[in-house]
Amino acid sequence: IGDIIGIKGTMFKTKVGEVTVLVKDFTVLNKSLRPLPLPKVDSDGKEYDSFTDLEQRYRQRYVDLIVNSQVKDTFIKRTKIINTIRNFLNEKSYLEVETPILQPIPGGATARPFITHHNALDIPLYLRISDELFLKKLIVGGFEAVYEFSRDFRNEGMDKNHNPEFTILELYVAYKDYFWMMELTESLIEKVCVEINGKTKIEYDSKQIDFKAPYDRISMFDAIKKFTGYDVSNMDENELRSVCNDMSIEVDDSMGKG
């Protein structure tokens, strides 16, 4: 980390069995012009010079990767997750495809698109907000199972968990229902968890989550009743607004049941 050198020499083992190199020549390959913000601890146990400022970490991700190993681990895990999903689907003979990023009509989702202009055709084009419609056209065209890891773009709000460009997996299979998709999703998530962590149980936010399939299934109506105490299955719009008001949920007269 920092200065990088290349060495020439002879490999050997030390008396304690550690593999090392007897250096005969070296070359400076890269010189670090500024000291890295590596954390230091003084005699009182106080740590300083840590690279902890969130704004700096996000804007200088290369430094963050050098000094915070857990960030690099996240990058590696992300790649492993994508590869595991891809292998899982390929083993089932699903076809990975690529669909257009620049589209004449943004579709497949309700979102504000980024707009650009095609000079040769003199027409506006949109960065895709979803690849759904093109994948469905492939199903109509005779491919029975297709999927795509795509970069999608939505010109909307932004926060820690909401980025204007993001990677999404979309999968479509002919002649199947959503119960089948539930089973596929369960087995896929379990497979990924085991491949990445070596087990189905993980710790998240001081809680243990077990991704061992199958998972509990519950309808939306039953979930609302379970967690709020209200049975909304037969309520009209006025009754639903009253329930929302009781739970301090902001609504107005323009909102319907959806």
Tell me the role of every PLM-derived stretch.
Residues 1-258:
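Class II aminoacyl-tRNA synthetase catalytic cores and aaRS-like
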